[in-house]
Amino acid sequence: MNDHKGLGGLDTEATPGSFGAGEPPRALGQAGLAAENELDAPLASKLMTVNLGPSHPAMHGVTRAVVELDGEMIRSMKLDIGFLHRGFEKSCENVTWTQCFPYTDRLNYVSSIMNNVGFALAVEKLCKLDVPERAKYLRVVTSEIHRICDHLTLVGAMAMELGAMTVFLYAIEARDIIYDRLAELCGARLTSNYGRIGGVARDTPDGWIEKTEKTLDRVKGYVDEIDQLVSRNRIFIDRTRGTGVVPRADAIELGFTGPCLRASGEPYDLRKAAPYLVYDRIDFDIPVGTNGDNFDRFQMRMEEMRQSDRIIRQCFAQMEPGEIAVQDFRYVLPPKPLVYGTIEGLMAHFKIIMEGIQVPAGEAYGYTEAANGELGFYVVSDGGGRPYKLGLRAPGWPMLAALPFMSVGSLLSDLIPTFDSINMIGGEVEQ
């Protein structure tokens, strides 16, 4: 017999007939089975619907995203737009051709001159106008200046919403000094109203080119500083690499253009593929990404700002004195001495102001490589002083429509940099 004693001196050896001796364990009761099954069953989760917008600080405009979440994972997304719809196309059909320019300013208001240029190119095709050389160069210069402004806005906002507030301050400071130069040229910092059918509104003030070159030097310093702060920052890279991925084939299928398409590996740029104005005389490179993710889209903007700097400086070197608008007073207001000194000048001025320019009947499509991609204007004229029909191809809409494709299956925290990287501008998308 085992003499071992348990606690309290009790004999720990089981005797025949005692509990647990010589018999199998008894079956678990219903409560025990339920407890055992709960341990084996997966954790239950409940889907949650979250509204982002329409007045959310990260949405960059009044856009609403209805996101269905499984924990932190996005399971589905629906976009709700139209909060900023102003009837752009119909409004333009009720004013003269020249009066359309302020409406185009309010599409992508961060780079408004590009909108002016695209509309002017479409109307000039119908009128068969050949714009003077200096006007072409001024259009390119101002468009590229506004491209830098647009990209600085994206770079600053995207970095800020990932925690890099310093980058935002640098970007806004750089953009602010560029707006100072635009205000000197156009009279306005944001909505420029600089475009005109047949040319541009005004020539450069004395010393403006030299001041702009010095401004570009300062902006280049800011861009280099931003590059050092975030492009090799481990946190920034981890948050942007591999998120919001759009492969090349899908980007083409979804209708991407501009930096978002090039970030996916497709080297398509209208300034090279279908040159307009004087882009065929300018030497510049087209940056192309490889992964099509948020990091590549960020880097596209960084490099494009440097290329825009190259383009502007080459335009300054090539540009010569000359007219800034065609001297056809059916389309351009005559100079004041002619208006006040001749009956022909007075009549031409009166007809343009009261009736608008008379655009030959027909239809045309004008395009530009805007900051976000291909910006297109389809115009139809019945021979009168107002557009019969105007259609807009907004570059931001295909990217916004693809946001569910880019975000479903990823984390909620990745949605914000993905949204930033497409640079959705509400005025352009919702018109």
Curated annotation (Swiss-Prot):
NDH-1 shuttles electrons from NADH, via FMN and iron-sulfur (Fe-S) centers, to quinones in the respiratory chain. The immediate electron acceptor for the enzyme in this species is believed to be ubiquinone. Couples the redox reaction to proton translocation (for every two electrons transferred, four hydrogen ions are translocated across the cytoplasmic membrane), and thus conserves the redox energy in a proton gradient. It is a peripheral membrane protein. InterPro entries: NADH_Q_OxRdtase_suD, NDH1_su_D/H, NiFe-Hase_large. The lineage of its organism: Bacteria, Pseudomonadati, Myxococcota, Myxococcia, Myxococcales. It is found in: Cell inner membrane. Pfam families: Complex1_49kDa. It catalyses: a quinone + NADH + 5 H(+)(in) = a quinol + NAD(+) + 4 H(+)(out). The keyword Cytoplasm does not apply. It is an enzyme of class 7 (translocase). One of its GO terms (molecular function) is NADH:ubiquinone reductase (non-electrogenic) activity. Keywords: Cell inner membrane, Cell membrane, Membrane, NAD, Quinone, Translocase, Transport, Ubiquinone. NDH-1 is composed of 14 different subunits. Subunits NuoB, C, D, E, F, and G constitute the peripheral sector of the complex. Gene3D superfamilies: Cytochrome-c3 Hydrogenase, chain B. This is NADH-quinone oxidoreductase subunit D 2. GO terms for cellular component: plasma membrane. The gene is nuoD2. Residues 1-27 are annotated as: Disordered. It comes from Anaeromyxobacter sp. (strain Fw109-5). The keyword Flavoprotein does not apply. Belongs to the complex I 49 kDa subunit family. Its EC number is 7.1.1.-.
